[in-house]
C-alpha cells in the first residue's frame, strides 16, 4: 500500500533525521517535494540537497544543517494542508509563523513559494507546511 500523503512523509523523515542528528536523509522524489526542499535551502533550514537516481527511481538526498551546539536548525516542521483536509488562504490572511521566525510554504498559481513572498506578490494558495 502506498503512502497517502507523500509530502507529510517527507517532512516526517526530515524531522526525525534532524532530531536523531543524522547528516543526510533520502526521500522519494516528486516535483512538489523538490520545490519544498528548494525553499528549505533558500531559507537556510538545510545545507543542501541533491537529486539521486537509485535503481531507476528518483530520490532527493537532503543534507541537514546544524548550529555550533550540534542542534538542528529545524526546531519544528508541520504539515498544514492534507489530502483529506485542504487548507487555502488568500494573501490578506496569510499569517506569519512564530512572529516572523518561521517560514510558511504556500503553493500558489505562481508556483511554490514562501508566505512572505506570496503576500508581496498578492497571491494566495494552498498552505503546504510551516517550518521554524
Curated annotation (Swiss-Prot):
HAMAP family the record matches: Ribosomal_uS8_B (MF_01302_B)
Domain of life per record: Bacteria
UniProtKB keywords: Ribonucleoprotein, Ribosomal protein, RNA-binding, rRNA-binding
Annotated protein name in UniProt: Small ribosomal subunit protein uS8
NCBIfam families: PRK00136.1 (NF001109)
One biological process term in Gene Ontology: translation
GO terms for MF: rRNA binding; structural constituent of ribosome
Function: One of the primary rRNA binding proteins, it binds directly to 16S rRNA central domain where it helps coordinate assembly of the platform of the 30S subunit.
PANTHER family documented for this protein: 40S RIBOSOMAL PROTEIN S15A
Oligomer and partners: Part of the 30S ribosomal subunit. Contacts proteins S5 and S12.
Pfam families to which the protein is assigned, alphabetical: Ribosomal_S8
Family the UniProt entry places it in: Belongs to the universal ribosomal protein uS8 family.
SUPFAM superfamilies, per the entry: Ribosomal protein S8
Keyword field contains RNA-binding: yes
InterPro entries xrefs: Ribosomal_uS8 (IPR000630), Ribosomal_uS8_sf (IPR035987)
Gene Ontology CC annotations of this record: ribonucleoprotein complex; ribosome
Amino acid at each position: 500500500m502506498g503512502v497517502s500523503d507523500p509530502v507529510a512523509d517527507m517532512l516526517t523523515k526530515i524531522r526525525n533525521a534532524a532530531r536523531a542528528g543524522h547528516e543526510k536523509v533520502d526521500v522519494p522524489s516528486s516535483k512538489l517535494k523538490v520545490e519544498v526542499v528548494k525553499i528549505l535551502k533558500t531559507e537556510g533550514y538545510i545545507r543542501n540537497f541533491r537529486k539521486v537516481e537509485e535503481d531507476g527511481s528518483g530520490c532527493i538526498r537532503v543534507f541537514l544543517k546544524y548550529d555550533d551546539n550540534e542542534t538542528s536548525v529545524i526546531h519544528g516542521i508541520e504539515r498544514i494542508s492534507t489530502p483529506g483536509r485542504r487548507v487555502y488562504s488568500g494573501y490578506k490572511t496569510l499569517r506569519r509563523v512564530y512572529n516572523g521566525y518561521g517560514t510558511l510554504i504556500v503553493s500558489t498559481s505562481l508556483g511554490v513559494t514562501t508566505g512572505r513572498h506570496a503576500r508581496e506578490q498578492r497571491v494566495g494558495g494552498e498552505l503546504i507546511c510551516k517550518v521554524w
